[in-house]
């Protein structure tokens, strides 16, 4: 293998091992060729340079072998950094960013500008053809003000998703591009809203009739015991996922991620994955190997 070989093989020592990896990946490449996979990109995999490079190369690898990746990203740490630079208070209520007018301007500047274009450039430098977008472009995502079942203070321009129009994304995929979407959207009057990136990824996956939704996180996946990584649940269905939430096994920040997966599955996405983005080549390991590395959710265990 030449020095220009994809980095996904650099950690593998022997030629025999390399051949084994390719042999194991082949049926998955054949199975998912032409299929759409929506990747929510965030967490440590977005912040740490070594992991960031590997995720980008994984995305380009998937596109190169005929799979159609779509990237949806957040950028919380970068937003916080810029708010602090501008002496704007960083506030959260119930896990949601308090987003007043000036904060919304910073959120849009950072997500749709700096973070989005950085990801696009990295993909292009790695050999892909990425196009940067936000939910406002082509009216991909229409937002509405966030509604909470609990009484809470006004949190400003935090939005829920009213509807998704996938036509622009579909056109880009048809032309061989990798769409990269930031989670900023507008309501019917053109007001910008900050949308949860997990939610945006899940709803977009459903609208695209995607084969897979993959959430890159900073946890191994869904754990029976959150203090023991070896208690990873590798496969579960919608009923089991809801049961784990009701029993309190799934709690805290994992609840909205699991709910996002469940909603995507209920709308026709074939599988949803919660994957540890801190693992090297997490995407390739989850999509192209027999065992995977995270938790896979399906509509029914019969699938």
From Swiss-Prot:
Enzyme's top EC category: transferase
Record-marked site positions (Transition state stabilizer): 40, 257
Gene: argB
Name the UniProt record assigns to this protein: Acetylglutamate kinase
Top-level taxonomic group: Bacteria
Entry keywords, A to Z: Amino-acid biosynthesis, Arginine biosynthesis, ATP-binding, Cytoplasm, Kinase, Nucleotide-binding, Transferase
Organism: Gloeobacter violaceus (strain ATCC 29082 / PCC 7421)
PANTHER family (alphabetical): N-ACETYLGLUTAMATE SYNTHASE (PTHR23342), N-ACETYLGLUTAMATE SYNTHASE, MITOCHONDRIAL (PTHR23342:SF0)
Gene Ontology molecular functions: acetylglutamate kinase activity; ATP binding
Gene Ontology BP annotations: arginine biosynthetic process via ornithine; L-arginine biosynthetic process
EC numbers on record: 2.7.2.8
């Amino acid at each position: 293998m030449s020095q220009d070989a994809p980095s996904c093989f650099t950690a593998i020592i022997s030629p025999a091992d390399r051949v084994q990896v390719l042999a194991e990946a082949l049926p998955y490449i054949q199975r998912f060729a032409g299929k759409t996979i929506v990747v929510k990109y965030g967490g440590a995999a977005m912040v740490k340079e070594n992991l960031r490079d590997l995720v980008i190369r994984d995305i380009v690898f998937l596109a190169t072998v005929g799979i159609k990746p779509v990237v949806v990203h957040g950028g919380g740490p970068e937003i916080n950094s810029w708010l602090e630079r501008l002496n704007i208070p960083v506030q959260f209520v119930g896990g949601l960013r308090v987003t007043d007018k000036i904060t919304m301007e910073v959120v849009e500047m950072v997500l749709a500008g700096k973070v989005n274009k950085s990801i696009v450039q990295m993909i292009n430098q790695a050999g892909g053809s990425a196009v940067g977008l936000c939910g406002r472009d082509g009216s991909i995502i229409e937002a509405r003000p966030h509604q909470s079942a609990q009484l809470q203070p006004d949190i400003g321009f935090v939005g829920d998703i009213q509807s998704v129009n996938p036509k622009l994304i579909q056109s880009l995929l048809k032309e061989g591009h990798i769409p990269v979407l930031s989670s900023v959207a507008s309501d019917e009057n053109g007001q910008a809203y900050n949308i949860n990136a997990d939610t945006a990824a899940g709803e977009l996956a459903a609208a695209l009739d995607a084969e897979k939704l993959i959430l890159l996180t900073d946890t191994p996946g869904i754990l029976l015991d959150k203090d023991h990584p070896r208690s990873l649940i590798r496969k579960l269905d919608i009923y089991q996922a809801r049961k784990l939430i009701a029993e309190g096994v799934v709690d805290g920040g994992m609840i909205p991620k699991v709910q996002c997966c469940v909603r995507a599955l209920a709308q026709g996405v074939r599988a949803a994955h919660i994957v540890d983005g801190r693992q090297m080549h997490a995407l390739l390991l989850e999509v192209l190997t027999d065992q995977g590395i995270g938790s896979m959710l399906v509509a029914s265990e019969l699938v």
